[in-house]
Structures are given as structure tokens and as C-alpha cells.
Amino acid sequence: MSTDAASLTKQMLLDPGFELTLRPMRYPQFYEMYRDAIRNSWTVEEINFQIDISDLHSKMTAADRHLIHRLVAFFATGDSIVSNNLVLNLYQHLNAPEARMYLSRQLYEEALHVQFYLTLLDNYLPDPTERFKAFAAVENIPSIRKKAEFCFKWIDSLQDLKRIETREQRRQFLLNQICFAACIEGLFFFAAFAYVYYFRSRGLLPGLASGTNWVFRDESCHMEFAFECVRTIRSEEPGLFDEAMQQQVYDMLEEAIECELAFAEDVLSGGVAGISMRDMRQYLQHCADQHFAKLGLPQRYHVRNPLPFMELQDVQELTNFFERRVSAYQVGVSGEVAFDHAF
């Protein structure tokens, strides 16, 4: 562990070690992200699912319910997979205490999301057998298993790596972080959010939509942190991001899109009015292009967002919620959130 200020300035984010020195702070942007995350606090207990339960029983078709059951099954384990990667791979290799502070907060938020989805399961699937099936979906439902296998492949890519020392190991780390930000949070979860907001556009499932607003905000911040890490590493070690690495990123997102489209084919198999496979493919390509831009790469698909209900989703509710938290707990945020800005 170094304590000399001059030597600290020479250290890079992926240098092996476990730096503990916060002053002088090398990456204040990570510390500010941590502080912003603290202000974005919310609790699952503030979500009311009563109207949702009524909607499920009286206002939804069999095709709608199939979509929801598949969505809940994906949510049952999705955030736990992200948490595992944070603990097993990211925390030990980002050698800046301010970055690890943010990861600690992100881990808390992922646990909060797990609690939200557990509460969702308890309300939407009161039958214990159905709940068990939802948690076993990563093994028993092919479209969800395909996404899980994609995730596990990238977790395994770093799991046995104790120190990042070579150029190839640094590339491995970057690809893992890009995968979990751009593919898992930025495609798998953002596609799931699109289904939620589709139901919201029909006036259905307000409890699910309210909780998703807050999860959406958290996940957007998680992605921005990961992209900032990638930009920082790229500026410190520009030689890592060569043409071969860029092609790996393109191929990775293309594979993730195909995994998510297999899930879309499953969840939309009953014929859900108002959303199609073509819509979902274009939406995923649109999201991927936004991620390429964040990574400093040329866009590949050049398509618009085909889902009008994803252009601006309930900004006033988000604003009012966080303003209430400022008054009551002094941990809220103010301002507007426009979901069409990046997604």
C-alpha cells in the first residue's frame, strides 16, 4: 500500500494491489457518484401492489400473464447474478478506494432490487410451487437459461484471476465490465423494463411500474459508473482498446441481443397486442448503439427507438418521490429524468 502522494499519481486503476488512501483522491468522479447514489435512497415498503393483483386477475389476457410470469422468473435471479460478479470479480481489481465505495453502494442497491423482486414474486405468485419454479427458471426455462449461461460465461472469464498484470488480463477485465454494464444491465434489464412500461402505457400494474422507475434510475447510474471506469482505464492505457478489442465488444453485444431476442420470442409467443418481435429487435439495437457511443465506439445499427412508451416514462412521479425524500429524510434528489436521452 502506497502512502507517497507522488507515487499515487502514477498508479492506474487496474494496477495490482489494494490501495486505501483517499487523500489525495485520484478519481473524485467515483466519489461523487457514490454521494449521488446515497441521495437516491428508496425502500421496497413504499410500493403498493394491491392494484397490480387486481389487474392480474381481471384485466389481463392469458398472453399478458404469460409475459408477466416469464418476466418475474427472470427478475427472480437476475440481480443476484450481477451481485455475484461485483463481489467475485470487480471489487478486488479496481484499485481505488473511492471506486470501491461506489461498488459497495451498488451491491446494497442490487440487494434492494432483489428484495423488490422477491416482494413482487410473493404478490404475483402466491402459490409456493409457482414461486419455486420462478427461482428455478435459470435451469428449466430455455430462454432464461440462455441468458444466464451468457452471464456465467463472463463471470467465469475472471473468476480465477487473482491479479491483473498482463495486457491480456486487463482486456479480460474490461470485457467483463462492459458485458455486465452494456449487455446485462443495459440490454437484458432494459428490455425487461420496456415490457413493464408497455403495461404501464395500458394503465396496468402501477406498483410494478413505480418500483421499476427507481430500479431503472439505479441501473442507469450503475451503467454510467462502469462506463466511466472503462473510459478511465482507456485514457490511462489507450493501447488496450485496439481493433481486436473493439470487435470483441461488437460481437459481445450482438450475442447479447440474440439471447434477449430468444427471450422476447418466448414472452411474446401468445401474441401481445402493441409490441412485436420487430419492435424489440429495433429497441435492443437502439440501446446497443447508445452503449457503443458511451464506450467511444462508432454506432452499428443507426435505428430509432420504436417504443414510444420508453421515450419519457413518468418523470413527474420520480421527481415528486425524490423531492418528498428531501423533505422527510434529506436523502433525495431533485431534477428531471428523461429516459429518451440515452435509451
Predicted features by range, described:
Residues 51-74, 134-183, 201-206:
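Acidic/His metal-coordination segments adjacent to aromatic residues that form catalytic metal sites
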Residues 75-83, 106-121, 141-148, 181-192, ...:
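Alpha-helical transition-metal enzyme core signature, strongest for iron centers
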Residues 29, 139-142, 279, 313:
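Alpha-helix boundary/N-cap detector
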Residues 88-161:
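Long, hydrophobic, well-ordered secondary-structure blocks that form the structural core
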Residues 2-24, 238-343:
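Extended, helix-rich structural scaffolds rather than catalytic motifs
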Residues 89-101, 123-131, 163-176, 194-214, ...:
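Inter-helical turn/loop segments and adjacent helix faces that build the functional surface
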Residues 1-52, 58-60, 64, 94-101, ...:
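Extreme N-terminal leader/anchor segments
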Residues 52-105:
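Long, hydrophobic/aromatic-enriched structural stretches that serve as scaffold segments
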